[in-house]
């Protein structure tokens, strides 16, 4: 990864992996000078089905303990949904009951794992808590745990024409509001589709409208070692192309690019 100009990685195995494999990956990252940006939980700790919910809570606690053990910047998940699809859009996702369950689940995960070297974070989503930066501030206050922080995915918050076309102003205000809490970032792009009605598509970096140079500068201002993780591409070749593109684009703009 260092040869590609990268300075951060996502941890490739979960807490159920053999201890020697976990230690080997963590040791390799440390030897190469790579920041372990995040350990993903990616499950639904507020699932309506009790069996799924219990399994998800167990996984979140295990993943947070793993992140703490290996010194990752954070363990990241989404809040979870009220329906059968773990990351799905449902009306009830905006209910007070769902808010209360989200706060309770985050507290229980952090209290059970008791991290001291890392943070539990929620990746924002367009259709669940936290749906906007103001709600993320409310969530931080409601959870009231020192080891709860922010995972920044700016593209997921571009949900209107105003935010889309004024993305530079939007991202600056978001970093001003949440910057001190941010532990890791996803970097990608967003493109408005021509078809009616209003449709936004997540794209690879450079295929949308976001000012990625400004995004990287704002992240760097918060933390010069802030991980910026590319995601949701379909092959190794696509990732290599995206890394090369982003590195060239940011270097041309005079923006540090080591992640």
Question: Could you tell me what each predicted segment is?
Answer:
Residues 10-24, 44-54, 83, 126-132, ...:
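Acidic-and-aromatic substrate-binding clefts and catalytic sites of carbohydrate-active enzymes
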Residues 27, 31, 50-150:
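Active-site acidic/histidine proton-transfer and metal-coordination neighborhood
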Residues 1-3, 18-39, 62-71, 107-115, ...:
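Acidic (Asp/Glu)-rich catalytic clusters
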Residues 9, 39, 104-204, 209, ...:
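Acidic/histidine-rich catalytic cores of soluble enzymes
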Residues 1, 29, 56, 67, ...:
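Conserved, mostly hydrophobic/aromatic
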Residues 187, 224-233:
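Short acidic/histidine-rich active-site segments
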Residues 239-257:
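C-terminal helical cap(s) of enzyme catalytic domains, especially alpha/beta-barrels
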């Amino acid at each position: 990864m260092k040869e590609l100009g990268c300075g951060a990685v996502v941890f490739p195995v979960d807490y159920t992996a053999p201890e020697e494999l976990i230690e080997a990956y963590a040791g390799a990252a440390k030897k190469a000078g790579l920041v372990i940006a995040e350990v993903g939980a990616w499950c639904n700790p507020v699932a309506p089905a009790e069996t799924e919910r219990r399994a998800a809570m167990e996984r979140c606690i295990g993943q947070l303990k793993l992140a703490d053990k290996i010194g990752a910047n954070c363990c990241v998940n989404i809040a979870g949904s009220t329906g059968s699809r773990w990351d799905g859009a449902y009306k009830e996702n905006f209910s007070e009951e769902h808010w209360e369950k989200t706060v309770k689940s985050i507290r229980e995960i952090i209290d059970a794992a008791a991290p001291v070297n890392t943070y539990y974070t929620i990746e924002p989503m367009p259709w669940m808590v936290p749906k906007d930066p103001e709600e993320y501030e409310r969530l931080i206050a409601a959870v009231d745990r020192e080891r709860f922080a922010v995972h920044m995915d700016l593209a997921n918050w571009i949900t209107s024409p105003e935010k889309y076309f004024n993305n530079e102003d939007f991202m600056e205000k978001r970093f001003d509001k949440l910057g001190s809490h941010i532990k890791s970032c996803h970097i990608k792009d967003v493109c408005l589709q021509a078809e009616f009605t209003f449709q936004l598509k997540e794209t690879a970096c450079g295929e949308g409208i976001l000012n990625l140079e400004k995004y990287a500068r704002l992240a760097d201002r918060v933390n010069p070692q802030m991980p910026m993780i590319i995601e949701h591409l379909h092959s190794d070749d696509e990732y290599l192309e995206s890394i090369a593109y982003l590195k060239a684009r940011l270097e041309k703009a005079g923006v540090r690019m080591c992640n």
